[in-house]
């Protein structure tokens, strides 16, 4: 596999998330310290569709943002050449300019695009967006932080 991509096995080594909360299936491209393009395949089998909404399943917006944050984490860890361990955690620190533009439904492929704007002292600022069929689904500016917990 290309060094600039990640399959699910590499993703599992970088992110602590597991089913049902792992929301990145593959990294299509990563430009070290600059940007990442990843994918979340959305299926009817997602557990959140049972209640959101049974009559017309729609992916919750907060989970679209979480998928973007997970892609951002992969970009951040690659930028600083680290693999997270049990003594550190990657937190959301803020979201700005969040706009939802279209619903995401079963069968959609959510393309996650994240650009690293700046990083300093373990704080990362990103510009992020997710698309379905080249149509904007959500956009946001994300702030995340890596912190030691032990």
Curated annotation (Swiss-Prot):
Pfam families: FabA. It is an enzyme of class 4 (lyase). Gene3D superfamilies: Hotdog Thioesterase. It catalyses: a (3R)-hydroxyacyl-[ACP] = a (2E)-enoyl-[ACP] + H2O. It comes from the Bacteria. One of its GO terms (molecular function) is (3R)-hydroxyacyl-[acyl-carrier-protein] dehydratase activity. It is found in: Cytoplasm. Its main location: cytoplasm. The active site is at 52. Its EC number is 4.2.1.59. GO terms for biological process: fatty acid biosynthetic process; lipid A biosynthetic process. Keywords: Cytoplasm, Lipid A biosynthesis, Lipid biosynthesis, Lipid metabolism, Lyase. The keyword Lipid biosynthesis applies. GO terms for cellular component: cytoplasm; membrane. Involved in unsaturated fatty acids biosynthesis. Catalyzes the dehydration of short chain beta-hydroxyacyl-ACPs and long chain saturated and unsaturated beta-hydroxyacyl-ACPs. Belongs to the thioester dehydratase family. FabZ subfamily. This is 3-hydroxyacyl-[acyl-carrier-protein] dehydratase FabZ. It comes from Albidiferax ferrireducens (strain ATCC BAA-621 / DSM 15236 / T118) (Rhodoferax ferrireducens).
């Amino acid at each position: 596999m290309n060094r600039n991509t990640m399959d699910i096995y590499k993703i599992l080594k970088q992110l602590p998330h597991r089913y049902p909360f792992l929301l990145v299936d593959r990294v299509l491209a990563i430009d070290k310290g600059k940007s990442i393009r990843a994918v979340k395949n959305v299926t009817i089998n997602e557990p959140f569709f049972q209640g959101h909404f049974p009559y017309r399943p729609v992916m919750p917006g907060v989970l679209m943002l979480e998928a973007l944050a997970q892609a951002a984490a992969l970009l951040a860890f690659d930028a600083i050449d680290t693999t997270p361990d049990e003594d550190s955690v990657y937190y959301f620190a803020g979201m700005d300019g969040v706009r939802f533009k279209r619903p995401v439904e079963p069968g959609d492929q959510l393309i996650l695009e994240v650009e690293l704007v700046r990083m300093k002292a373990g704080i990362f600022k990103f510009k992020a967006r997710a698309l379905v069929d080249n149509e904007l689904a959500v956009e946001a500016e994300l702030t995340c932080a890596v912190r030691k917990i032990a």
